[in-house]
Amino acid sequence: MESNRDEAERCVRIAKAAIEAGDKEKAKRFLSKAERLYPSSEARALLQAFEKNDTAGNGPQSAKMAKGTEQPKAEKDSNASASSDTGKGHTQDQLDGVQRIKKCKTYYEVLGVSTDAGEEDLKKAYRKLALKFHPDKNHAPGATEAFKKIGNAYAVLSNPEKRKQYDLTGSEDQMQNNHRNGGFDYHRGFEADITPEDLFNMFFGGGFPSGSVHTFSNGRARYSHHQHHHHSGHDREDERADGGFSMFIQLMPIIVLILVSLLSQFMVSNPPYSLYPRSGQATKRVTENLQIAYYVSKDFQSEYSGILLQKLEKNIEEDYVANVRNNCWRERQQRSDLMHAAKVYRDERLKVKAESISMENCKELNRLTSLFRGG
């Protein structure tokens, strides 16, 4: 998946250059290729913008992006690609599963858990469903949307604040009364802070995009910078490389299943702490070093003290910092995507939305960095 991501990012860069040059057909082709290799919010946003402009007919914005007449061949190619996806083989069981997910009215029904399900119950349910409905494994019509809905359900229910808000508001029907465009809705109401593919990679292996990130080790701060490697080549070379990536993608589900079966043996018992209050772990404590709040059971003090407690609190702080770092990365990525879309389509509303992102996790990450540096 790592090589797919790099190639997908390169396809997005080529597509951006094509947009600026007015070559709409080439831009759409490379954006579609990027989505096949490694789905991303940036490529998806650009493709959706193309679709909106296509439906707008010969309006000013459509003419500005195309800088010329539309090519009927591009639409035929797009339709042919879509029909080929739905034509892949699938079982009746897979189709029935997709229909079940579609009919679910609440996120609890989607994951098949009770309303008082704990963190471990949510994780187990997500692992099982994510593997079953991942688009690389399940080719039934609607499987991709079902996979997105499963990821969105876990992302909301695993976040205490979003879950509390969701429980107060109600089912998915109430969230969608004001926008009946058909299908599943992932961009309004209760939005997940992470894409379904990123969530899947966090569970089953895979990293975050390269860039400037903070890492913490042995109580000290360390700053590392990874640079993107720019590749050059012709379009025909890009197309030939697809064969190797496709083979790797086909083998991924088998590799993931093997890893899950090996790791499941080590994930049976619940951790002795939680970063958020939950059933059985409601007693609040703070770490001695960073003053990070965590929650434990009533008999915690009788089991953890001295060196054992110090080691546990070190793990808690590392867990907290990793959480903040990942959330900061998502905030930066979201702001970057919106700013780029605002620049390309000259949409002031997107720019205002990007600037309104609070970046709370990045502020917290800077605070921790200053703390480790003695600031």
Swiss-Prot record:
Gene3D superfamilies in UniProt: DnaJ domain
Family: Belongs to the DnaJ family. DNAJB12/DNAJB14 subfamily.
Protein name per its UniProtKB record: DnaJ homolog subfamily B member 14
Parts of the chain on the Lumenal side: 264-375
Cytoplasmic-facing ranges: 1-242
Keyword Transmembrane helix: yes
Annotated stretches, region: Disordered: 48-95
InterPro entries per UniProt: DnaJ_domain, DnaJ_domain_CS, DnaJ_subfamily_B/C, DUF1977_DnaJ-like, J_dom_sf
PROSITE patterns in the cross-refs: DNAJ_1 (PS00636), DNAJ_2 (PS50076)
Main location: endoplasmic reticulum
Membrane topology label: Single-pass membrane protein
A biological-process GO annotation: chaperone cofactor-dependent protein refolding
Keyword entries, A-Z: Chaperone, Endoplasmic reticulum, Membrane, Transmembrane, Transmembrane helix
Domain J: 106-170
Role of this protein: Acts as a co-chaperone with HSPA8/Hsc70; required to promote protein folding and trafficking, prevent aggregation of client proteins, and promote unfolded proteins to endoplasmic reticulum-associated degradation (ERAD) pathway. Acts by determining hspa8/Hsc70's ATPase and polypeptide-binding activities. Can also act independently of hspa8/Hsc70: together with dnajb12, acts as a chaperone that promotes maturation of potassium channels by stabilizing nascent channel subunits and assembling them into tetramers.
Organism: Xenopus tropicalis (Western clawed frog)
Subcellular location: Endoplasmic reticulum membrane
GO cellular component: endoplasmic reticulum; endoplasmic reticulum membrane
Keyword Endoplasmic reticulum: yes
Record's signal peptide: none
